[in-house]
Every structure is written in C-alpha cells, then in structure tokens.
C-alpha cells in the first residue's frame, strides 16, 4: 500500500465526515442566505435609486416652476416700472404745463398791472398838465370848475376806455 493510496483513503474519509456532519448543506444554506441577503440589498438599492430619481425629477420640476415664476415676477416688475415711469412722466408734463400756465398768468397779471400803472401815471400827468395849462390860461374859479368836471367819474371812465 502506497502513500498515494493512504492519501486517497484519507481524502475519502474526510469527505465522508463532511457529508456525515452535513457540512455541504450548511455551506449551501450559508451561501443561499448570503445570496438572498445580497439580492435583498440589490433590490433595496434599486428601490432607493428609483426613489432618488423620483425626488430628482420632482426637484427639477419645482426648479423649472420656480424659474417660470421668477420670470413672471420679473416681467410683472418690468411692467410695473414702465407704468410708474409713464405715470411719472405724465405727472411731470402736467406739472410743467401747470407751471407754464401759472407763469403766463403771472406775466399777464404783471402786464395788466404795468398797463394800469402807466395809465394811472398818464392820467395823473395829463391832469397835472391840464391843471398847469388851465391855471395859466384861465382864471382860478373857471379852472377849478374844469378840474372838478374832468375829475368826475364819467370823464375818468371815458379816459380809461380811450387809453385802453
């Protein structure tokens, strides 16, 4: 009996002991459990991946909505600014028109005042000149009568209408 024979017998006995103690079934059971655990982990990873993709899609949709809302807000703000500018421009033009109208009224009033002053001065000068001429040419009684007549309201209103 050779060494090879005894090595073969030892191998057969070892394998028989393994079968007797059900080691191959235990190894198979352990490998099956590990394969099941790995399969469960892969299923969980796929489920988590799908959930992550759903969340990503939802956030991308929300981001797109937020962009759209931001663009709408910007457009509304631009429209509001344009409205405010147009209103301010209209008010400024109206203010300038009112100021010009007021200035024209003040100028017209100043012209009227100047005309009245010149008319009044001209009347006073005419009266003074008439008084001096009358005093030289007429006696004092007749001069006073003519001055009183000239200063009457009727004659003053006639003079004003002629001067205007």
UniProtKB/Swiss-Prot annotation:
It comes from Bartonella tribocorum (strain CIP 105476 / IBS 506). The gene is atpF2. This is ATP synthase subunit b 2. F(1)F(0) ATP synthase produces ATP from ADP in the presence of a proton or sodium gradient. F-type ATPases consist of two structural domains, F(1) containing the extramembraneous catalytic core and F(0) containing the membrane proton channel, linked together by a central stalk and a peripheral stalk. During catalysis, ATP synthesis in the catalytic domain of F(1) is coupled via a rotary mechanism of the central stalk subunits to proton translocation. Component of the F(0) channel, it forms part of the peripheral stalk, linking F(1) to F(0). Belongs to the ATPase B chain family. PANTHER family: ATP SYNTHASE SUBUNIT B, ATP SYNTHASE SUBUNIT B', CHLOROPLASTIC. GO terms for molecular function: proton-transporting ATP synthase activity, rotational mechanism; proton-transporting ATPase activity, rotational mechanism. The chain crosses the membrane at residues 4-24. It is a single-pass membrane protein.
